[in-house]
């Protein structure tokens, strides 16, 4: 079983590290090509392209300038510990993962990334902001989907083959999973959907849904799941599988309003 998740805009390069294990990203030669393109952009270009403040644009221009691919624990950090968005708040790897959990995650979890393509949890990364959906002109086209082409799909196929089955649990956002070509992916894709109750109606609430993707990732990793039927047992923080609303490989989990944290 292979899990895909999205990265996060919020980064943490300060907290104590929960593991000393690390690996190098597999697609750095492509990252270097993107960095070359990004270095051509001024701060104002970055602000416009990414729709961010001048201050954030200046920070990211500096990051592009300082980026260099000799990654060490002194100038980079493991991806699973560097990202700090809602998905990672739900996963709580730094707080809860054992060494064995990190090793299982290394084989069964992949983070899709605009700059790095595909990151394993223990892959070192330097700070960046480059969302998959932005329009960045490059030698292969006008956006990152054209740049990555089938590279991300092929990398996931290699990971699927290495870990021994063809089940992929898609916990990434649509923006990021659009970088994957399902027709060329050697996998059965499972899509969990998380619905929260609000004023008596169940719907996808972005903050809760993102956190739930992290909770589901943690559940798969800590319980060492290997069978897609086991996904229905997910019950962290009040979510319950709803068979009536699930269809095929779309698994629906619902949570009553009073159980939300």
Curated annotation (Swiss-Prot):
Listed GO CC annotations: cytosol
Domain of life: Bacteria
UniProt-listed InterPro entries: YaaA
GO biological process: response to hydroperoxide
HAMAP family recorded: UPF0246 (MF_00652)
Similarity comment text for this entry: Belongs to the UPF0246 family.
Alphabetized NCBIfam families for the sequence: PRK02101.1-1 (NF002541), PRK02101.1-3 (NF002542)
The protein, known as: UPF0246 protein PMI0005
